[in-house]
Amino acid sequence: MTAIRGAVNLTPSSAAAHSHLSRGLAFAGYSDEAIQHGEAAMRLSPLDPEMALFRGGIAIAHFTARRFDESLRFTEENLSLRPGFQGAQRLHCASLAQSGRVEEARAFLSTVRRNHRPPLTIAWVRENVPYQTPELMELYVEGLRKAGLDK
Protein backbone atom coordinates (compact mmCIF):
# COMPACT_ATOMS: atom_id res chain seq x y z
CA MET A 1 0.00 0.00 0.00
CA THR A 2 2.97 2.29 0.59
CA ALA A 3 3.90 2.20 -3.10
CA ILE A 4 0.35 3.04 -4.18
CA ARG A 5 0.18 5.93 -1.70
CA GLY A 6 3.49 7.11 -3.13
CA ALA A 7 2.04 7.03 -6.64
CA VAL A 8 -0.91 9.17 -5.51
CA ASN A 9 1.46 11.62 -3.83
CA LEU A 10 3.66 11.84 -6.94
CA THR A 11 0.76 12.13 -9.39
CA PRO A 12 -2.33 13.37 -7.53
CA SER A 13 -4.10 13.93 -10.85
CA SER A 14 -3.84 10.23 -11.79
CA ALA A 15 -7.26 8.62 -11.71
CA ALA A 16 -5.62 5.20 -12.04
CA ALA A 17 -3.45 5.77 -8.95
CA HIS A 18 -6.47 6.85 -6.89
CA SER A 19 -8.42 3.84 -8.17
CA HIS A 20 -5.69 1.36 -7.22
CA LEU A 21 -5.37 2.94 -3.78
CA SER A 22 -9.14 2.86 -3.35
CA ARG A 23 -9.29 -0.89 -3.97
CA GLY A 24 -6.28 -1.60 -1.77
CA LEU A 25 -7.76 0.39 1.09
CA ALA A 26 -11.17 -1.22 0.62
CA PHE A 27 -9.76 -4.75 0.78
CA ALA A 28 -7.95 -3.76 3.99
CA GLY A 29 -11.12 -2.37 5.57
CA TYR A 30 -10.30 1.36 5.38
CA SER A 31 -13.70 2.05 3.88
CA ASP A 32 -14.07 5.81 4.25
CA GLU A 33 -10.62 6.55 2.85
CA ALA A 34 -11.21 4.04 0.04
CA ILE A 35 -14.41 5.83 -0.93
CA GLN A 36 -12.62 9.18 -0.99
CA HIS A 37 -10.01 7.85 -3.42
CA GLY A 38 -12.61 6.10 -5.57
CA GLU A 39 -14.59 9.33 -5.81
CA ALA A 40 -11.38 11.21 -6.67
CA ALA A 41 -10.70 8.76 -9.51
CA MET A 42 -14.22 9.25 -10.88
CA ARG A 43 -13.91 13.03 -10.62
CA LEU A 44 -10.51 13.09 -12.33
CA SER A 45 -11.57 10.92 -15.26
CA PRO A 46 -15.38 10.84 -15.52
CA LEU A 47 -15.42 9.15 -18.94
CA ASP A 48 -12.65 6.65 -18.22
CA PRO A 49 -13.13 3.24 -19.85
CA GLU A 50 -12.06 1.71 -16.51
CA MET A 51 -14.92 3.37 -14.59
CA ALA A 52 -16.08 -0.06 -13.39
CA LEU A 53 -12.78 -0.42 -11.52
CA PHE A 54 -13.16 3.03 -9.97
CA ARG A 55 -16.66 2.16 -8.81
CA GLY A 56 -15.45 -1.28 -7.73
CA GLY A 57 -13.28 0.12 -4.98
CA ILE A 58 -16.26 2.04 -3.65
CA ALA A 59 -18.47 -1.05 -3.81
CA ILE A 60 -15.90 -3.09 -1.88
CA ALA A 61 -15.54 -0.29 0.68
CA HIS A 62 -19.28 -0.22 1.34
CA PHE A 63 -19.30 -4.01 1.64
CA THR A 64 -16.47 -4.06 4.19
CA ALA A 65 -18.28 -1.31 6.14
CA ARG A 66 -21.37 -3.55 6.08
CA ARG A 67 -23.34 -1.03 4.04
CA PHE A 68 -24.63 -3.77 1.77
CA ASP A 69 -27.35 -1.72 0.07
CA GLU A 70 -24.77 0.87 -0.97
CA SER A 71 -22.46 -1.87 -2.18
CA LEU A 72 -25.34 -3.21 -4.27
CA ARG A 73 -25.93 0.19 -5.81
CA PHE A 74 -22.34 0.29 -7.03
CA THR A 75 -22.21 -3.34 -8.15
CA GLU A 76 -25.41 -2.84 -10.16
CA GLU A 77 -23.84 0.17 -11.88
CA ASN A 78 -20.65 -1.81 -12.49
CA LEU A 79 -22.56 -4.68 -14.01
CA SER A 80 -24.40 -2.30 -16.31
CA LEU A 81 -21.00 -1.00 -17.49
CA ARG A 82 -19.32 -4.42 -17.68
CA PRO A 83 -21.84 -7.28 -17.41
CA GLY A 84 -19.14 -9.97 -17.41
CA PHE A 85 -17.01 -8.36 -14.67
CA GLN A 86 -16.45 -11.37 -12.39
CA GLY A 87 -15.34 -9.37 -9.36
CA ALA A 88 -18.50 -7.27 -9.50
CA GLN A 89 -20.62 -10.38 -9.99
CA ARG A 90 -19.14 -12.07 -6.91
CA LEU A 91 -19.47 -8.94 -4.77
CA HIS A 92 -23.04 -8.38 -5.98
CA CYS A 93 -23.92 -11.93 -4.98
CA ALA A 94 -22.32 -11.62 -1.52
CA SER A 95 -23.93 -8.19 -0.98
CA LEU A 96 -27.38 -9.52 -1.89
CA ALA A 97 -27.01 -12.35 0.60
CA GLN A 98 -25.60 -10.18 3.38
CA SER A 99 -28.40 -7.64 2.91
CA GLY A 100 -30.96 -10.39 3.54
CA ARG A 101 -31.95 -10.88 -0.10
CA VAL A 102 -30.89 -14.52 -0.01
CA GLU A 103 -33.28 -15.80 -2.68
CA GLU A 104 -32.03 -13.16 -5.14
CA ALA A 105 -28.46 -14.05 -4.19
CA ARG A 106 -29.12 -17.73 -4.84
CA ALA A 107 -30.61 -16.96 -8.25
CA PHE A 108 -27.73 -14.64 -9.13
CA LEU A 109 -25.16 -17.22 -8.02
CA SER A 110 -26.23 -19.46 -10.89
CA THR A 111 -25.22 -16.67 -13.30
CA VAL A 112 -21.94 -16.18 -11.48
CA ARG A 113 -21.15 -19.89 -11.58
CA ARG A 114 -22.01 -20.17 -15.27
CA ASN A 115 -19.66 -17.31 -16.21
CA HIS A 116 -16.82 -17.70 -13.70
CA ARG A 117 -13.52 -19.00 -15.01
CA PRO A 118 -11.97 -20.89 -13.35
CA PRO A 119 -14.96 -22.49 -11.58
CA LEU A 120 -15.96 -20.55 -8.47
CA THR A 121 -15.26 -22.29 -5.16
CA ILE A 122 -14.69 -21.10 -1.61
CA ALA A 123 -11.08 -22.31 -1.93
CA TRP A 124 -10.62 -20.20 -5.08
CA VAL A 125 -12.05 -17.16 -3.29
CA ARG A 126 -9.76 -17.58 -0.29
CA GLU A 127 -6.74 -17.91 -2.57
CA ASN A 128 -7.52 -15.13 -5.06
CA VAL A 129 -9.67 -12.41 -3.52
CA PRO A 130 -7.33 -10.12 -1.57
CA TYR A 131 -9.24 -9.27 1.62
CA GLN A 132 -6.53 -8.34 4.11
CA THR A 133 -8.06 -9.53 7.38
CA PRO A 134 -9.63 -12.85 8.33
CA GLU A 135 -12.76 -10.98 9.48
CA LEU A 136 -13.29 -9.35 6.09
CA MET A 137 -12.61 -12.58 4.22
CA GLU A 138 -15.15 -14.37 6.41
CA LEU A 139 -17.75 -11.65 5.80
CA TYR A 140 -17.33 -12.16 2.05
CA VAL A 141 -17.23 -15.96 2.19
CA GLU A 142 -20.26 -15.97 4.49
CA GLY A 143 -22.21 -13.98 1.91
CA LEU A 144 -21.26 -16.41 -0.84
CA ARG A 145 -22.16 -19.38 1.38
CA LYS A 146 -25.57 -17.85 2.16
CA ALA A 147 -26.06 -17.56 -1.60
CA GLY A 148 -25.38 -21.28 -1.92
CA LEU A 149 -21.67 -21.59 -2.68
CA ASP A 150 -20.87 -24.66 -0.62
CA LYS A 151 -17.32 -25.69 -1.40
Residue ranges and their predicted role:
Residues 1-12, 16-151:
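Alpha-helical protein-protein interaction modules
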